[in-house]
Design a protein with these regions (language model features):
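Alpha-helical transmembrane segments
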Residues: 132-138, 194-206, 262-266, 299, ...
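Aromatic-capped, Gly/Pro-kinked transmembrane alpha-helices
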Residues: 426-430, 454-534
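Alpha-helical multi-pass transmembrane bundles of energy-transducing inner-membrane proteins
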Residues: 20-28, 112-197, 208, 276-337, ...
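Short aromatic-rich membrane-water interface segments that cap or initiate transmembrane helices
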Residues: 64-82, 195-199, 361-371
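C-terminal ends of transmembrane helices
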Residues: 14-25, 91-104, 145-160, 210-224, ...
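Transmembrane helix-loop-helix hairpins at membrane boundaries of multipass inner-membrane proteins
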Residues: 1-5, 13-105, 111-112, 489, ...
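Short helix-boundary/re-entrant hairpin motifs in multi-pass inner-membrane proteins
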Residues: 58, 65, 196, 200-259, ...
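Predominantly late transmembrane helices and immediately cytosolic-facing juxtamembrane segments
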Residues: 183, 313-327, 331-336, 361, ...
């Protein structure tokens, strides 16, 4: 039971905070102080857990009817601890940076909702068997829907959200099918080989569960909520899926899986990187940030690079958490953002260095090129959004600005805490080429933007002519990734299915509607009693 302490603490603290803040009407400052202290305590507990790695919890007779022998196993491994630590660290940073967003939204709902989301995210990361993973994913969906309903002022959830949860449900069903086909009683890490069908179902299920499709639109116009609760909301599901993939042994013997998923994932990642870099602001580009890293992770997984997945996850949370939680621009936050970028590029002996470790030893030259270009573009986009000017908020008190800065600093320090237990792996992952090119690319892009060259290029007829087909392709991709085609198809199917009903209703509403009703009633009654004669 010791392994469940962080989860139980988060649940207990969320209930206490909701009670004292909602029913006792405690001041917002005092409520925040209790919240910050609570999540920091859980964060410290998780660090202690990495030092001792307590034994997991195994539930054998979980079904009172005895109709299933599948185990429920919850534990932390060396890899899954990193994902749990990233998630809880993101929660701590969210709470600390929320000091500059006091009174700009329902802070109580934001904080307790973020704690609940983190709790169910930890529950999923802890899951060590397929059945436990399936249950945890279902719980995540239920909690997210409940929080969205409480936050969104409209009476109905946007259709994009409905399709998003529908795709997640389909992903869960695919993993259920994999569980039925595999009939494996071992933990996920204990299974070294899956059949082709089971492996394919697991990859497809994880892809749909990533939660990046369809590309979401904001469900609320409240920017503070989008920065705090929205950030946790968009990271919980992907982190839980990445943790799941880090436990499933890649099956390199299925070459056709690699040949299909690797190019598709890389092209998707490249598209997401370009859209992220050209987005108007970081919140508009957030779905593309998630899409790009999801594609890179999937491509790395099918090639068998688990350490690369861990490094990509650190970059996704480190860079994404920093840029999405940063509410205003200051000299300090800009410098810290550049430090964050240097940490992300994967210099040797840094926590993110495995992001380049598999190059050029594996994969085709074209795949390695697309992978590298995608990372370069992501880093350039990150620098662009860091340097993009925002209105600096000087109206906040000094202590609010202090904790806000501490929250951003924490995000930069998180990877260095993980390296304490990963240095033996990090020191063997040395690649200078990728990081150096990344730094040069970011520097050149900054210098070019500072000149008149971009404006001259954008205004040139040759550029406009070249961008015409690119704009058409981009429009097609946007419609595909936002699932506009699905909405159109669904509407047409719905219209087709409702035609007989509309015809039937039109008949009944006519002048002879009563006679038709009696006739149909007589026919139905005769069928039920079996008295039809011919």
């Amino acid at each position: 039971m010791l392994i469940l302490v962080p989860i139980l603490l988060l649940l207990l603290f969320a209930a206490i905070i909701q009670f004292v803040g909602g029913y006792r009407h405690l001041s917002i400052g005092s409520t925040w102080l209790i919240t910050a202290g609570s999540v920091i305590l859980v964060w410290i507990t998780l660090i202690v857990f990495r030092a001792i790695l307590p034994e997991g919890l195994s539930i054998n007779d979980w079904n009172p009817l005895g109709i299933s022998s599948d185990q429920l196993v919850y534990k932390l491994s060396e890899n899954t601890w990193i994902f749990a630590f990233l998630l809880v660290s993101l929660l701590v940073a969210t709470i600390l940076t929320d000091t500059v967003r006091f009174g700009q939204g329902n802070n109580l709902t934001t904080w307790t909702g973020s704690m609940l989301l983190t709790t169910v995210g930890l529950f999923s990361i802890y899951s060590h068997t397929l059945l436990a993973v399936i249950i945890s994913w279902a719980v995540i969906d239920i909690v997210e829907i409940g929080i969205l309903i409480s936050v969104i002022k409209n009476q109905r959830i946007h259709s994009v959200a409905v399709v998003e949860f529908g795709l997640r449900f389909m992903g869960t069903m695919l993993v259920i099918a994999a569980l039925i086909l595999s009939k494996s009683q071992n933990g996920i890490e204990g299974t070294t080989q899956f059949s082709h069908a089971v492996y394919l179902l697991l990859i497809l299920g994880a892809t749909l569960r990533l939660g990046v499709l369809p590309l979401h639109v904001p469900l609320t116009a409240n920017l503070p909520i989008r920065r705090s609760l929205g950030t946790i909301l968009r990271f919980v599901t992907p982190i839980s899926v990445l943790s799941f993939l880090s436990q499933v042994q890649p099956q390199l013997q299925y070459a056709n899986v690699i040949l299909f998923f690797n190019p598709v994932a890389l092209i998707t990642a490249l598209y997401g990187a370009v859209k992220w870099t050209t987005a108007g602001n970081e919140l508009t580009g957030r779905p593309y940030w998630m899409l790009a890293f999801s594609g890179l992770v999937l491509a790395s997984y099918v090639q068998g690079h688990i350490e690369t997945i861990v490094a990509l996850s650190i970059i996704m949370v480190l860079g994404g958490g920093y840029i999405f939680l940063r509410s205003s621009t200051s000299r300090f936050s800009t410098i810290l953002g550049i430090v964050c970028l240097l940490e992300m590029v994967g210099l040797p002996f840094t926590p993110t260095s495995p992001v380049w470790s598999h190059l050029p030893a594996s994969g085709t030259a074209f795949a390695n090129f697309v992978y590298s270009i995608t990372l370069f573009i992501l880093f350039i986009g990150f620098l662009r959004h860091v340097l993009r000017s925002k209105k600096e908020d000087t109206s906040k008190e000094m202590w609010m600005q202090l904790f806000y800065s501490v929250g951003l600093i924490l995000l930069v320090l998180i990877p260095w805490i993980t390296i304490i237990w990963r240095f033996s792996v990090i020191r063997s992952q040395v690649n200078w080429v990728g990081p150096i090119i990344s730094i040069i690319a970011c520097g050149l892009s900054y210098l070019i933007v500072r000149t008149r060259v971009p404006r001259l290029i954008l205004e040139s007829p040759a550029y406009k002519k070249a961008m015409t087909p690119a704009a058409v392709v981009g429009k097609i991709l946007v419609e595909f990734f936002t699932f506009e085609w699905f909405y159109l198809l669904f509407r047409r199917i719905y219209t087709l299915l409702t035609l007989p009903i509309k015809f039937f209703v039109k008949i009944l509403e006519g002048d002879g509607g009563l006679l038709w009703s009696l006739l149909f009633l007589a026919l139905i009654a005769s069928v039920l009693v079996g008295e039809i004669t011919f």
